[in-house]
Amino acid sequence: MLEKIFPKIHSEGYKFLAIAIIVTIFLYVLSTFLGLIGLVLSIWVYYFFRDPERISINDENYLTSPADGEVLMVHEVDGPKELGLEDRKFTKISIFMNVFDCHVNRTPCEGKISEILYKPGKFLNASLDKASEDNERNYYKITNTHGEEIIVVQIAGLIARRIVCESSKDQQLQQGERIGMIRFGSRADVYFENYESLVKVGQKTIAGETLLAKK
């Protein structure tokens, strides 16, 4: 119960929370009002870097959301050319994470990471379609238990300035397992074949729990 009210924070947040607390103490010495502003800032930093436990369905016939946020797009596209998949058609679901969403990303399926590819880029608004090709991003190619390739892409946004990858090539993953995070506003794209989408544009998602697609 306590974990639900006060979830642990991601290790990426330790430094930011420490800085926020120090600033809060300094501001409180100057003024109670300023100290309260600092306290609100500290609470927001804690909230942003929260890393709650999630319970996945653990079913190979479903894909779960890789991110908390809102579904921006659901459409058929060519596969990412960066991974040599441009000659194949995939369903692509894009999920936008605003600064109030949990930014820890998770794998949508059980499987093995066959490739991780980082691409430097711009920091355009992550809600724009061209962010998929222009922004800083990190690709994960995951081979699921059916032998199919599921692609997850972390995309940095207008405010985000660091993509954190916590996984490695050939790592075996369980559905809903953490693979990384993005700091301060961003987006996650999922590419898949042979699954039927279960979500619609505007729908809210929870990483590791919301069902994105089914066989």
Curated annotation (Swiss-Prot):
Note accompanying the cofactor annotation: Binds 1 pyruvoyl group covalently per subunit.
Cellular component per GO, a single term: plasma membrane
Keywords: Cell membrane, Decarboxylase, Lipid biosynthesis, Lipid metabolism, Lyase, Membrane, Phospholipid biosynthesis, Phospholipid metabolism, Pyruvate, Zymogen
Keyword Nucleus: no
This protein's encoding gene: psd
Family per record: Belongs to the phosphatidylserine decarboxylase family. PSD-A subfamily.
Cellular compartments annotated: Cell membrane
EC class: lyase
Membrane topology (UniProt): Peripheral membrane protein
Keyword Membrane included in the entry's annotation: yes
Catalytic residues of the enzyme: 186
Protein's name in the database: Phosphatidylserine decarboxylase proenzyme
GO terms classed as biological process: phosphatidylethanolamine biosynthetic process
Annotated pathway: Phospholipid metabolism; phosphatidylethanolamine biosynthesis; phosphatidylethanolamine from CDP-diacylglycerol: step 2/2
Subunit relationships: Heterodimer of a large membrane-associated beta subunit and a small pyruvoyl-containing alpha subunit.
Cleavage (non-hydrolytic), annotated site positions: 185-186
EC number in record: 4.1.1.65
Lineage: Bacteria, Pseudomonadati, Pseudomonadota, Alphaproteobacteria, Candidatus Pelagibacterales
Purpose: Catalyzes the formation of phosphatidylethanolamine (PtdEtn) from phosphatidylserine (PtdSer).
